[in-house]
Amino acid sequence: MKRKVLAMLVPALLVAGAANAAEIYNKNGNKVELYGKMVGERILTDRENGEKGDNSQDTSYARVGVKGETQINPELTGYGQFELDLEASNRHNPDQTRLAYAGLSYKDFGSFDYGRNVGVAYDAEAFTDMFVEWGGDSWAGTDLFMTNRTNGVATYRNTDFFGMV
């Protein structure tokens, strides 16, 4: 009986889309973290006008990334992140880099980074981008106009408006 429950539980956990992280190194103000996520999903669609073929699509994927930071001095921190998106079916799109940036964070003045990152307009939209599927696609689903991930973007972020909020 226990084996049957375990045999059903393990695949369910793999398909559930769990995200995990592991701290690889943390010493003297230097930190490196490895993280990942696996999602198993299939979309069923209706075919019209007698179209032939499978009426489902495998949209399973895995994401793996590494991020790190180093304390340069008590007020200045360097940080970076790299994240890769791996599609299970890989039929239409090759594996792609989701994030790849490096930057500096100053204690009282915010942070500045450069690379492939989410644009600053996404910060406002991120509060509503919580859906399981197709969330925020109405205006933030592209790699343009700083509304989602984009290449070669320099971003400045400040969380407390220079200590006034």
Feature map (PLM): residue ranges:
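Alpha-helical architecture
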Residues: 1, 16, 69-72
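Serine/threonine-rich low-complexity intrinsically disordered regions
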Residues: 1-2, 93
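Sec-dependent signal peptide recognition
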Residues: 2-11
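Sec/Tat signal peptide C-region and signal peptidase I cleavage site
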Residues: 15-23
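Outer membrane beta-barrel
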Residues: 23-43, 53-165
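Glycine-centered low-complexity coil/loop motifs and glycine-rich tracts
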Residues: 46-48
